[in-house]
Amino acid sequence: MPLVYHAPALKKRTVLFPRGLTRGRRAGMVKKNTWEVFVMLYPFNALLARMKYITRWSLMHSTRAESLSEHTCDTALLAHTLCLIARRYTGTPCRPKTVAVAALYHDAPEIITGDLPTPVKYHSATLRDAYKAMERESVASMTAMLPDELAEEVAPFLTGELLTAEETKLLKAADRLSALVKCLEEQRSGNHEFDAALAQQKAVLEAMHCPEADWFIAHCLPCYTQNLDELTRQDG
């Protein structure tokens, strides 16, 4: 649902409607003879910006808090890398740019539902199904914050329905790799709170049988334990 904005004056990008022609949408207005000035506001992106206030791993002691925005960015970068690995090395058909954008939206419904801890989310089939239903309602609520034309474009990214089975698997692997990296960082800082979570993420990734993730773990993951000097050193 668009928000209300009372336009102080007629300016560029201001939409004019005759009185009463609002088509059911709320809008701000300034009387000007027989016309009213309507400026439609859509809060979708402002709501997305709130991801930075949602803290992940909320039931665990962390040496450094991780926001949903950070996780989303990391997942998008990892998803893009996995897709490039797929195209160059493993031959898995995928669209790197499409998967990367889908990754940017993959946890957006948590702005409304909150980041429910994994042990709670998957405690039972009842809870899991209820949470999935909440996610669907969240997507519907969020897309309603856009014009219909834009909502049609964004909705498939929020739901992931535009992805193929192979692309969905790559995105899920990237999501798990982001969690794995977080666990490694916490463990490296001496925080044993994440030991079990680290083992769990490794087991899940292994069970996925994702060759792109396996390639990344073999060739890229060890670099996450290096310091800045080691990362930027140029041999030879």
Predicted segments with their positions:
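N-terminal amphipathic/hydrophobic targeting modules at extreme N-termini
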Residues: 13-16, 23
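Short, linear, compositionally biased motifs with a strong N-terminal bias
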Residues: 19-20, 234
